[in-house]
A protein has these predicted regions:
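TRNA-recognition modules of translation machinery and tRNA-sensing kinases, especially anticodon-binding
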Residues: 2-193
Length: 193
């Protein structure tokens, strides 16, 4: 049911309806009623199950995490990449695997207006590889080292500390086979913690 539009009472002007005389609005202003838990979601304004708002009271924590991720990634010469939140579903079906739980049960998949199956990204690696190939990064000096952060989506069963929309920081190195890259990625992750 759509939320009803709330109107404020006024002390100016008049109201008029068909066949009725003009009457002055009430002179006394109505004081709003504030519930004991003013921070609780009002009916019709709740977040979807498994989703969470980031509020100003939490800003310092989120900005600190973003800043730390950025500083660490840049210290190891990773360049920032941002990929779309919405991708062609085929990208993840191919990269993650058709029979996997992520593809079969957890992806948010829907048809766009052109009848293309699209999804909210469940992870970022496939999108980064798509961008690498799509933008011809294989022709630039290798390896290509990128980092990202942002929201990912999986239709999991929400639990304490586990949401359907979650934020992920990650680093990818493409075009290098030396295992020293694995050691570097472990070091980056360790320094982030």
């Amino acid at each position: 049911m759509p939320a009803q539009k709330k109107t404020k009472p006024t002390t100016k002007g008049a109201t008029k309806s068909a066949g009725a005389k003009k009457t002055a609005a009430p002179k006394a202003a109505v004081k709003p009623v504030v519930k004991a838990d003013a921070g609780a979601n009002q009916k019709g304004y709740e977040t979807l199950r498994g989703m969470k708002d980031i509020l100003p009271k939490d800003e310092k924590y989120w900005l600190a995490a973003y800043s730390t991720a950025s500083n660490i990634a840049q210290a190891y010469s990773y360049g920032y990449i941002e990929t779309p939140i919405v991708e062609n579903a085929k990208l993840f079906i191919r990269s993650i695997g058709k029979g996997t739980d992520v593809v079969e049960k957890e992806m948010y998949v829907f048809d766009d207006r052109d009848a293309t199956k699209v999804c909210l990204r469940p992870e970022a690696t496939a999108s980064v590889v798509r961008a690498y190939i799509g933008h011809g990064m294989q022709s630039v000096p290798q390896p290509v080292k990128v980092w990202y952060q942002g929201p990912m989506f999986r239709h999991d069963r929400p639990q304490a500390g586990r949401y359907r929309q979650f934020h992920q920081f990650g680093c990818e190195v493409i075009g290098e086979k030396d295992p020293v890259v694995d050691a570097e990625l472990i070091t980056v992750a360790y320094n982030f913690l």
